[in-house]
């Protein structure tokens, strides 16, 4: 196998791992955001509207992370800087 094939194969494996980690991180983030919101609503029900607004703001910020990782992953796949 030549060096080009090895680099392409290693990049494909690495990008798959990166995509999996980004998905797992996003799922954990959603779980933490949701659990803390429910916990806050349980403690102070009158704060429900403010907590929900904050939840959706932080959830939107947290969801941007996998899309940024997706862009970097596709950059490594299709415009691989390691191939020269």
Curated annotation (Swiss-Prot):
Pfam family, one: ATP-synt_C
Membrane topology of this protein: Multi-pass membrane protein
Transmembrane region(s): 13-33, 56-76
Keywords: ATP synthesis, Cell inner membrane, Cell membrane, CF(0), Hydrogen ion transport, Ion transport, Lipid-binding, Membrane, Transmembrane, Transmembrane helix, Transport
Compartmental location: Cell inner membrane
Protein origin, superkingdom: Bacteria
GO molecular function, a single term: lipid binding
Keyword 4Fe-4S annotated: no
Record-annotated site: Reversibly protonated during proton transport: 63
Gene Ontology CC annotations of this record: plasma membrane; proton-transporting ATP synthase complex; proton-transporting two-sector ATPase complex, proton-transporting domain
SUPFAM superfamilies in UniProt: F1F0 ATP synthase subunit C (SSF81333)
UniProt keyword Transmembrane present: yes
Record text on subunit structure and interactions: F-type ATPases have 2 components, F(1) - the catalytic core - and F(0) - the membrane proton channel. F(1) has five subunits: alpha(3), beta(3), gamma(1), delta(1), epsilon(1). F(0) has three main subunits: a(1), b(2) and c(10-14). The alpha and beta chains form an alternating ring which encloses part of the gamma chain. F(1) is attached to F(0) by a central stalk formed by the gamma and epsilon chains, while a peripheral stalk is formed by the delta and b chains.
NCBIfam families listed in its UniProt record: ATP_synt_c, PRK06876.1
Entry function: F(1)F(0) ATP synthase produces ATP from ADP in the presence of a proton or sodium gradient. F-type ATPases consist of two structural domains, F(1) containing the extramembraneous catalytic core and F(0) containing the membrane proton channel, linked together by a central stalk and a peripheral stalk. During catalysis, ATP synthesis in the catalytic domain of F(1) is coupled via a rotary mechanism of the central stalk subunits to proton translocation. Key component of the F(0) channel; it plays a direct role in translocation across the membrane. A homomeric c-ring of between 10-14 subunits forms the central stalk rotor element with the F(1) delta and epsilon subunits.
Family: Belongs to the ATPase C chain family.
Name the record gives this protein: ATP synthase subunit c
The encoding gene: atpE
């Amino acid at each position: 196998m030549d060096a080009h094939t090895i680099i392409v194969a290693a990049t494909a494996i690495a990008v798959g791992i990166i995509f999996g980690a980004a998905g797992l991180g996003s799922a954990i983030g959603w779980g933490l955001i949701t659990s803390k919101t429910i916990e806050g609503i349980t403690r102070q029900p009158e704060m429900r509207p403010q907590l929900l607004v904050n939840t959706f703001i932080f959830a939107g910020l947290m969801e941007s992370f996998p899309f940024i990782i997706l862009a970097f992953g596709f950059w490594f796949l299709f415009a691989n800087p390691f191939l020269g």
